[in-house]
């Protein structure tokens, strides 16, 4: 899709300014900047979410996963999964409190923007990715293996007890 290029690592919050100033030609924006990039004086040339939707035939975007060593044992892994699920459910059931907390890390963004961003990710798919989420994760790793970006390995997805 893009090919090889020279890249510059930086904090995600520095990307809009680096693009505006010409320090870099392009940047991958994440977090709430995916919603506010226009207000920050930069233009979208590719939406990775839209690209993924197209190539995956509508599977959810595998934004992040929790990776744990098998040596922790299934019981501890399942407990950790359960605690994370309960935390997300609590946030979903207490949006005003979750937003109050999120605003501490909002880097000057409006509460309305942060609410829109939070509601994109505090949802049922975040609690349980389901079959579609598992397919998405498998597809992502299959693509990465095919391109030589990750070594071949056996993907194991923890199932709720």
Language-model region placement:
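Short beta-strand-to-loop elements that line the ligand-binding cleft
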Residues: 3-12
